[in-house]
Amino acid sequence: MSVLKEYRTVSEVVGPLMIVDQVAGVHYNELVDITLHNGERRKGQVLEVQGDKAMVQLFEGSTGINLAKTKVRFTGHPLELAVSEDMVGRIFDGMGQPIDGGPELIPEKYLDIDGQAINPVARDYPDEFIQTGISAIDHLNTLVRGQKLPVFSGSGLPHNELAAQIARQATVLNSDDNFAVVFAAMGITFEEAEFFMNDLRETGAIDRSVLFINLANDPAIERIATPRIALTTAEYLAYEKGMHVLVIMTDMTNYCEALREVSAARREVPGRRGYPGYLYTNLSTLYERAGRLIGKKGSVTQIPILTMPEDDITHPIPDLTGYITEGQIILSQELYKNGFRPPINVLPSLSRLKDKGSGEGKTRQDHAATMNQLFAAYAQGKQAKELAVVLGESALSETDKLYVAFTNRFEEEYINQGFYTNRSIEESLDLGWELLSILPRTELKRIKDDMLDRYLPKADTTMTKVFVAND
């Protein structure tokens, strides 16, 4: 068996990859122990086996490896994570090793980080609401337990602050079930790592969170393993401990860049923009680990965050992510420049499962109707503002001016809630009604009369201010 053999037949090292000759009984994904000439120990994983040659990806980099004196031992099992319920409240590096100075964890079991394929027949349909405390998500792009809902950001936008806000505020309503957040940060700077750790500690959110941090100067191979380690932890807490787990993964662009780096080192034929041709398949092995299982109490919900290179939504990373996931939350450069936080652009954003997690018994009976009316009114108000820029304010009708007033207040009060305001779904719904009261009742055509009679406040026309863009 290969597990009993030690090889000194390293023939080549290229970037994060090492070639070992004259091997036997070695398997794909097998964990590798590497001992350098100075006694230093490193880990690797078998990427490919051809004949008697094995290609090994190195987790700690290839610096200092002496081809003739390096010893390689194949362990006979894949990379596994030691899991325990005591992981909640702890901080780990990208490979699952504690870095918070806490007590040593006693593992309850060891799990393969690649997980197990979920039989589609065993999946349960996501239909239960998760409250993030952010109106633009909870009310307009509802997040449902078991869903995968990515955030598409851009360079310089505050996606880290949004990720921390969701980690702090996310909760399950009307349930005594345990809720946990698994946070995986990939390729981030020391400053960003400090921000996440301090924010979760200072707000007390660390007590229900598991934090995995892969820094920008850590090896690319580790970056590829980090989200799998985080998802393995989430699956353990969800399906074996009955917890509802929200997994936040940032930044998936850094993950994909690591895939491209390893692919280039393997001299593979590149696909679109140099990314490997299997990028879609690889991303699906992460995103499809979200969900609920019939007969299991817990659930795994994902919010992957990615920065779109050059703000290009047709770039392979957001493009392929959109095919796999169930919607997207898009951050806007324009809203950010105008001082709105979080700068969520609600019109192109979408949660494909929002109808499944809203309504009476889940949120409130007026949820869907007000959501549709707010979308329609905001879109019409944006059109009126654009018309005023071209033709002037005098070209607007009185109704158009009311739509402009609605749009400005919608952005200033509804979207611009700040990163430290936690709104309940009832507060978001009530604020939506308050803003809709700016418009004439005859314009609220997407809401039934009985609902208007019950929820629509009386508009104070003397207080309505009309703002028209004069750019």
Curated annotation (Swiss-Prot):
- All disulfide bonds of the chain are none
Keyword Cell inner membrane among UniProt keywords: no
Q: Which PROSITE patterns match?
A: ATPASE_ALPHA_BETA (PS00152)
Q: Which InterPro entries match?
A: ATP-synt_VA_C, ATPase_a/bsu_AS, ATPase_F1/V1/A1_a/bsu_N, ATPase_F1/V1/A1_a/bsu_nucl-bd, P-loop_NTPase, V-ATPase_su_B/beta
Q: Name one Pfam family in it.
A: ATP-synt_VA_C
- From the UniProt record, which GO molecular function terms apply? ATP binding; proton-transporting ATP synthase activity, rotational mechanism
Q: Does the keyword Ion transport apply?
A: yes
Single biological process term from Gene Ontology: proton motive force-driven plasma membrane ATP synthesis
What UniProt keywords are attached to this protein's entry? ATP synthesis, Hydrogen ion transport, Ion transport, Transport
Any idea what job this protein has? Produces ATP from ADP in the presence of a proton gradient across the membrane. The V-type beta chain is a regulatory subunit.
Name the protein family. Answer: Belongs to the ATPase alpha/beta chains family.
Q: What is this protein called?
A: V-type ATP synthase beta chain
Gene encoding it?
Answer: atpB
